[in-house]
Amino acid sequence: LFEMGYVPNSGGDIGWCLGLSVVSSSKGAGTTYTNLTPSYACSFNTQDQRLKATCANYRWLYDNKQGAVDGVNIQPAKWCRMDLSVNNVESKGTGINFPILRYADVLLLLAEADNEINNGPTAEAKEMLKRVRNRAFANATNKNEMVNEYVDNLNDHDSFKKAIINERAWEFGGECIRKFDLVRWNYYSDAIVNTLEWVRDVTMNYNQLRLEGGEFVYDKTKEIVDMGIAPRLYYNYVNGEIQFENNYFTYRDNSASPYKEATTLADDDIKTAGASFDGLKYIKFLDTYISVSDTDPTTNTKYGTDADGNTIKKGVMNEAFLYSWFGLTDGVVTTGAEDMEPLRKKVTPYILPIPKDNIASSNGVLSNEGYAIRNK
């Protein structure tokens, strides 16, 4: 309904700091400042066509070569400067418009308001939600189940509101409005805790970790459960582009062929002359979040062996992920192994921090006290 309009070389940061990253190309370069979480990517139904349009585990390295990215760097796929019809575009002047108000937003806002006013969904509210989902599952074999049956089973206020909360996530992924939705629902802290716990629990399973004394301890006897989530994504190269062998929902046993023979291919290796793109490759999707080692990363000393002579290994949660919500987790979470339930009652401070230049020129009147901003 309304977009912020730009023209090439005269404005527009979309494709520069938001969208699929492009390291170098005839159409310029750009690196997204916004990544999506694996818990979000895995929340989609497999046949929801918004998934592929929203989440991508690759980026462009050159005009004709892609590189895979891990679960920490899931790309918002709705915009890409490689889709531009002109070359030699300034990096910060892509001319890609940015949506301000979409028709789907109007439909979902109407459905949400109707549910609140009537303390439950009316037929009109359900119809609005069906319209949005009808497009999302237009080509799905389970379309009737995902549209009509799904919505018709939402018959009370709470279940319909939860459906709206989820639908807005799936519909507007990467469009930079999710935080404000969560704030107005008073659901921001809960959403962060859900993400932290999801990543921790899934990664513990696939890395054979258990909690012991506030630490992640490796247990080789712990059975790996197929949770319908892929700890690794396997792929092949076809004409320089990545073709994934499995999706987010397909577990592959990396101890069995052909997956145990798969190799990694870093971006620096791709840039090397004579690099081989043959054979099955993989990128870590969830393995990245907790690294397992026999050495304490703080003291650089070995953990030693247990009573049976087995090498002791422990896991450490990815610091960048752990501190992504430092304003909420500060003072409560240091390793990721803690009970995070108390965080649900804590207010997340990151709403609209005051720019540092404004603070500096305010003669001490303004501050970001309470934001717990951490330069890390």
Regions found by a protein language model. Name each.
Residues 1-59:
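Hydrophobic-face positions in mid-chain alpha helices that act as interaction patches
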Residues 1-12, 49-376:
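Acidic/polar-rich alpha-helix caps and helix-coil junctions
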